[in-house]
Amino acid sequence: MLKLTGHLFAWEPKAEYMDYYERALYNHILASQNHETGMVVYSLPLAYASFKEFSTPEHSFWCCVGTGFENHVKYAEGIYSESENDLYINLFVASRLNWRRKGMIIEQQTEFPESDKSSLILRCAKSQTLTLHIRYPQWATTGYTIKVNDKIQEIEKKPGSYISLNRLWKDGDKIEIEMPKSLHKEVLPGDEHKFAFLNGPIVLAGEMDLDERKIVFLEKKDSELRDWIQPSNRTKTSFITKTGFPKNVELVPLYKKSDGHYSVYFDCYEPSEWEQIRKQYEEEDKFLREQERRTLDYFRPNEQQPETDHRFRGENVERGIGASSRKWCQAYDGGNFSFEMKVDPHAPVDLVLTYWGDDGADYQFDILIDDQLISSEVLTGSCRGEYFDKEYAIPFNLTQGKSEVVVTLHAHRWKKAGRIFGGRIMLRK
């Protein structure tokens, strides 16, 4: 997406492209690397109580590790852009530009995003007239100022634009930019109760404990954000919430999270709404925590690394994406697919498969563990419009003394097997 954004900007230099570029750079590219080890993630999870799973130097080394390392040249790639007599300052990154076309050196000094300030110092053998376009970020809603040689410049444009400075530039000229970051929240499209916190362009992650209950925020939706959140004493880029239930959480930039669990999206309800749904919410939360506690292994179909990790195999296999962007796989015309799953050699376990409730009698198949039949399934389409889980008890003699088994779904003749959207091995209750 950054490559595409760069092409779009080259055709039409609009600030909104670089607003996007900046967000992707800090919240995805920078957030994808462990800043202690240099390892990178396969994917960047945003769900509740997620954690980043990094590659290792010798064992977890998938194709995304190569592109994951390539990504980090992007920090320098989009800082500046030029045309014949114009220079665009797109990003606030400490850097030194050798503008050969004009015989000019521009040094940018900043600690952004730790700081809200940046300065540009010009070095040139001869004075020359040209235009410097300095980005006025969409998130800088108050207090944005530019000084040239200590003189404040009049700004008539609004956030989400470029400030154009056309003048005779001399050796030693200095431009100072101040751009206070604004705290704001953004609603997840399609769910008015779910939102994320941002500080300027920086996505904030709530530090979580996996065993904690799910955090919600109780606040009127039109209330000021200062009623929700306040600066933390921990660092100048961290915050702490004020209206969390059952507790408040520390918020730090997502790119700084290399270990521990975190959440990017949180639920928000007005107090009156919360009282109506609280019991249901707590029951769902209890179920999910119990499910996580019992889970020994989890398989996600139609994803390259999970299929590789679980040694996925198949014949007459189809893959796709269903509701809520959940990925699936199925076998057709008597085909089959299999994947390896971890088990407990000392305790009984169950297989849990996730289906789509609309799938009906076309899906008739056998489920086998290490080639031993444990169930024959016929889907009925009785849970329309929703996903559902179904548990299959695995006889203990099929797992006793083993650390892994092969799960196989084999379609009956002219029928389909699946469609599964996930598979779990869980300790039996």
Question: Language model features by range: what are they?
Answer:
Residues 1-13, 77, 123-126:
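Well-ordered alpha-helical scaffold segments within catalytic/enzyme domains
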Residues 18-27, 32-123, 158, 167, ...:
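C-terminal beta-rich recognition modules with glycine/proline-rich loops and embedded aromatic residues
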Residues 112-141:
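Long hydrophobic segments that form regular secondary structure
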Residues 118-120, 130-134, 149, 170-179, ...:
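Short, well-structured beta-strand segments within conserved domains
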Residues 131-138, 343-359, 363:
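A short beta-strand element within beta-rich, extracytoplasmic domains
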Residues 142-150, 361-374:
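Short, surface-exposed beta-strand/strand-loop-strand elements in extracellular ectodomains
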Residues 161-165, 337-339, 388-392:
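Short strand-edge motifs at loop-to-beta-strand transitions and within beta-strands
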Residues 374-399:
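Extracellular carbohydrate recognition and processing domains
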